């Protein structure tokens, strides 16, 4: 998560060109911060599933139970190696772009005892990223949201809260084993 920390120092060095130009810069930064966060989440999940038999089995069961009968038959014919590759490929293609998905994934894969995103506003910033990336920050009434340096700083702060919570749990789990 060093990339996100770099945003904080970069923000201190931005020149105030003008509100419109700054808002464009801040939109890019918010999208980047949350995209890095989502990639970090995916990397943690993939690493855990690929290195821990219990996590792989938990995730595989969840995936298998959600499949149609036809897809289950395809999975039943796969070797263990093929299943592992397929599950990891599915994880790489999976989107971690909502707080509920992140919470459920960490419960399934890490046996995280509570909602990893609770006590944070990360969901707000994930939605903000979606609004910026897919709608250019346009609201339903046709106007555009304007973003400020505080929005970027808050996005960084909220991602750091979740990352710290996750890393503390992982560190404690490793030390108790």
Q: Where are the model-predicted features located?
A:
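Helix-loop junctions and short alpha-helical segments
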Residues: 25, 29-122
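Short, charged/polar, low-complexity loop and linker segments
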Residues: 12-20, 109-113, 139
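Charged alpha-helical initiation segments
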Residues: 1-31
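Amphipathic, Lys/Arg-enriched alpha-helical patches that create a basic surface
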Residues: 119-131, 145-177
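Amphipathic, well-ordered alpha-helical segments in soluble domains
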Residues: 3-10, 32, 40, 128, ...
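Long, hydrophobic, amphipathic alpha-helical segments used as structural scaffolds
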Residues: 40-52, 110, 133-136, 140, ...
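Short helix/strand-bridging catalytic loops that position acidic/His residues to coordinate divalent metals
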Residues: 17-21, 141-152
